[in-house]
Design a protein with these regions (language model features):
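Conserved N-terminal segment of class I S-adenosyl-L-methionine
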Residues: 1-95, 99, 116
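Glycine-rich loops and low-complexity Gly/Arg-rich segments
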Residues: 59-62, 80-81, 107-108, 126, ...
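Active-site micro-motifs of SAM-dependent methyltransferase domains
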Residues: 89, 107, 138
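A short beta-strand submotif of the Rossmann-like class I SAM-dependent methyltransferase core
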Residues: 102-105
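S-adenosyl-L-methionine-dependent methyltransferase catalytic module, highlighting the catalytic core
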Residues: 110-118, 128-167
Length: 167
């Protein structure tokens, strides 16, 4: 259920991510936020609700299209820019950002050893980067909840089975 997932992301960001970031960096309507791997934009909503200037980037055009549809009616949508592009190839990011969000995405980014040094170019001098990832050893660490198969999507620990079990 995509709406349920969107809401979970939004609520988690509002209740946990923003308070965590605010211990290190105040968030105001003047804050410029970049989310890398924004998907349909669940993590973006709480920042947009606060009036922040938000940019979301994702390589998946379908998810960006859904995010554009979702946010077309948001009262602060003039503060939102959504970009479909590979972060390593993006040419549209000209601003420096106060906060960069990388939530449950870094495990999908190629060349991870180059990634954090690369994205520093988008960070303002006193900006912060928030990185969170699903622990592989948790029941749904393999993202099986997004499987189309109803049984497999609810099967915890499925991703830890030996490779031959997938054939």
């Amino acid at each position: 259920d995509r709406q349920l997932y969107f809401n979970e992301q939004s609520i988690t960001t509002q209740k946990y991510v923003i308070p965590f970031i605010e211990k290190h960096k105040p968030i105001t309507a003047d804050s410029h936020i970049l989310e890398i791997g924004c998907g349909e934009g669940g993590n973006i909503k709480p920042f947009l609700d606060l009036g922040c200037k938000v940019t979301g980037i994702d390589i998946n055009g379908g998810q960006i299209a859904i995010a554009k549809e979702i946010y077309s009616v948001h009262p602060n949508n003039r503060n939102l820019t959504l970009i479909c592009e590979d972060i390593y190839k993006v040419t549209e990011l000209h601003n420096k950002f106060d906060i960069i969000i990388i939530r449950d995405v870094i495990e999908h980014i190629p060349n991870q050893e180059l990634f954090l040094p690369f994205i520093k170019r988008f960070l303002s001098p006193h900006g912060v980067i928030f990185v969170a990832f699903p622990p592989w050893q948790n029941p749904f660490g393999g993202h099986q909840q997004i499987c189309n198969n109803k049984l497999l999507s609810h099967l915890p620990w499925f991703h830890l089975l030996p490779r031959p079990a997938y054939k």
